[in-house]
Amino acid sequence: MAAGKFASLPRNMPVNHQFPLASSMDLLSSKSPLTEHRPDAYQDVSIHGTLPRKKKGPPPIRSCDDFSHMGTLPHSKSPQQNSPVTQDSIQESPWQDRHCETFTFRDPHLLDPTLEYVKFSKERHIMDRTPEKLKKELEEELLLSSEDLRSHAWYHGRIPRQVSENLVQRDGDFLVRDSLSSPGNFVLTCQWKNLAQHFKINRTVLRLSEAYSRVQYQFEMESFDSIPGLVRCYVGNRRPISQQSGAIIFQPINRTVPLRCLEERYGISPGQAREGSLTEGRPDVTKRLSLTMGGVQAREQNLPRGNLLRNKEKSGSQPACLDHMQDRRALSLKAHQSESYLPIGCKLPPQSSGVDTSPCPNSPVFRTGSEPALSPAVVRRVSSDARAGEALRGSDSQLCPKPPPKPCKVPFLKAPSSPSAWLNSEANYCELNPAFATGCGRGAKLPLCAQGSPTELLTAKQNGALGPRNSGINYLILDDDDRERPWEPAAAQTEKGQWDKGEFVAPLLETVSSFRPNDFKSKFLPPENKPLETAMLKRAKELFTNNDPKVIAQHILSMDCRVARILEVSEEMRRNMGVSSGLELITLPHGHQLRLDIIERHSTMAIGIAVYILGCTGTLEDRAATLSKVIQVAVELKDSMGDLYSFSALMKALEMPQITRLEKTWTALRHQYTQTAILYEKQLKPFSKILHEGRESTCVPPNNVSVPLLMPLVTLMERQAVTFEGTDMWEKNDQSCEIMLNHLATARLMAEATDSYRMNAERILAGFQPDEEMNEICKTEFQMRLLWGSKGAQVNQAERYEKFNQILTALSRKLEPPPVKQAEL
């Protein structure tokens, strides 16, 4: 760009001082007249690239002009000195001693008009775009997804702290920007009570498993999955950002240019966060170009690789735009005709007291030309100091990906443990006290804030110390040790032995089933019994046949409410569960044992009904009558009791392949109990299908349900692996994924409506007096002892179900043998 300005100039010519080139570039408004010099004292004009090379001798003494951050217009001028001053942009002052070839350090605050012109030309190229293009680019950003932070005009990206304070002028004004002191985090800047305030948005990483994690954002109270959601809540509800400040936001300050323009205008890239924060409090400090080693290293490290605009500007031997850095590790560059010599060694400046330094000798190795280095090392920055003795990358080599850094043989320069300077400017935020849940992590034992990574969190956890508050990222991890550690509910009890409801009590992790068949005392069963004893089967059949279907349904509902912990839940049981109902407990991780018990009762009841149909009948008419009685009980459970859990168990028994294959039995049912058969085909089967597809909300009034459908949820949560064998019918549907989401959504509603289910069950069972014998055969322990015996009831679930499935198949084939195929002739 700048080379085109000088293309018409010859290499050897005296420059006319009456029309200086600097004035044509509108860089300097006014300067003192130049001191008269001989024409032969001027050096040749260098047009190699865009930056002139430093000549021999001491640097000229110039006046220090402070420019704005744009680098185009002067802010203020210091008094001029009468020493020789360079005014032309490409003209060099003559040196009196031409034999001096020593490297000198340049003061970063001394301005070089030539270097300022390079930055001026770049920013003029950036900003000289038509408003229509900028408006179109801004509209494209605002049309992104609402969850994308860039789609909100109140997000201003990487703007300095001082600029954000100037944008908020009235109480309630706010904007969101990137944190320059903590890259990757965000800051909300607002004005309240005529004072600009900055609130760092706390970022929490929830690690649900080794492969999945979720990020949440919060100020003090509620956490959100996205920053737009957080802002919408605080703006819409006029909620104070913090209790201490009471700041309320309601008026967003919108940006008028794309984020790219803001980034290029203020010259702050993601890697420049900490360096940029040093000068944010001083807007009058010029961000000027510098050929210092520190500037090169900082720009090399912090230049974003994905910025195509900046990469495009670097071509040939033109170096990248080098911004000013605070550390003054400078090294002048030697110039020889058109070749550039880049020294690899560096010289460390004098360190402040208290810092242990080790001198690094200069390396005599140089790289010539503008070819990329063969093995350029990445310059790394540790704290506020840098390593020495690493190669300086060329301008063209920056276009290529950086290779992994080589080990540095120079010892690190460790700064004292006192707070850094940048903490006093950018990292000062208003105090927030996030309300993290201490129940799962037990508060002080598990640190919620860790700076850097989860590894530091675990280290802090072992040391028993909390991490620093200003890290901005919180990791919540629940490891195996925390899960397996026995809970201590007694710690939450008062001295009088009473539970304080205002204090959190860690729930009890149950590991033993509530069903204990061997400890069950029965009027019908001896202490030890064999599976399927004939006398016990006949007694159970008599009770089932002689009672009304509604009475049987009431006994089943009463027992279901106890097993699911809907009714008869004591205070101690609530304290151990951590919730008030078992319907909510089955949705929580520590409800594992209750889910297993629910699966056990459901499967045992279905198998018991199948045995009642197949093994307790003699003639075809008896089987048809038994089938009719089961259907009537299912109707009562559905309509009168609202017990969808046991209703699904009875329907599972009726739809077993060992039952559906009994064609003669179903034919006799249609002939002798026609109304019951029609009721089963037209109402019960379609309703069961709707339930298992997650569409019960469309056909079941909520005020009529006492026990909801539980099996799809507990089956999904307890299934160890995805298998195609043993899956339910709804899982083989083409819409199985949508059905699964319906069941999960229903589970959330079920956990919220536990009080409604409890009141419905109490209303339905009001005045119910259970029969002792009928109540006993409805218990799960009795059914387990009856089906598997006293010894078989202790065997694994899967093994018991598999063997009994074979028994049912044998009974079904005995009652109605399969048709014999004719022998092939």
From Swiss-Prot:
Phosphoserine-modified residues are where?
Answer: 32, 78, 83, 182, 290, 358, 363, 375, 471
Residues annotated as carrying N-acetylalanine in the record are: 2
Give the region (Mediates the interaction with BCAR1/p130CAS) as residue ranges: 744-748
List, as start-end ranges, the regions of compositional bias called Polar residues.
75-93
The record's subcellular location field reads: Cytoplasm; Cell junction, Focal adhesion
User: Which residue intervals make up region (Disordered)?
Assistant: 31-93
Output a single Gene Ontology CC term carried by this record. cytoplasm
Cited Pfam families: RasGEF, SH2
Q: Where N6-methyllysine occurs along the chain?
A: 334
Q: Which positions carry Omega-N-methylarginine?
A: 442
**Which keywords does UniProt give here?**
Acetylation, Cell junction, Cytoplasm, Guanine-nucleotide releasing factor, Methylation, Phosphoprotein, SH2 domain
The record's annotation in InterPro entries points to:
Ras_GEF_dom_sf (IPR023578), RASGEF_cat_dom (IPR001895), RASGEF_cat_dom_sf (IPR036964), SH2 (IPR000980), SH2-Ras-GEF_adapter (IPR051853), SH2_dom_sf (IPR036860), SH2_SHEP1/BCAR3/NSP1 (IPR044102)
Where would I find the SH2 domain in this sequence? 154-253
Q: What does this protein do?
A: Acts as an adapter protein downstream of several growth factor receptors to promote cell proliferation, migration, and redistribution of actin fibers. Specifically involved in INS/insulin signaling pathway by mediating MAPK1/ERK2-MAPK3/ERK1 activation and DNA synthesis. Promotes insulin-mediated membrane ruffling. In response to vasoconstrictor peptide EDN1, involved in the activation of RAP1 downstream of PTK2B via interaction with phosphorylated BCAR1.
Q: What is known of its domains?
A: The SH2 domain mediates interaction with tyrosine-phosphorylated proteins. However, not involved in the binding to phosphorylated BCAR1. Required for cell cycle progression in response to INS/insulin. Required for regulation of EGF-induced DNA synthesis. The Ras-GEF domain appears to adopt a closed conformation rendering it incapable of carrying out canonical exchange factor function, this closed conformation is probably required for interaction with BCAR1.
Q: What is this protein called?
A: Breast cancer anti-estrogen resistance protein 3 homolog
Organism listed in the record: Macaca fascicularis
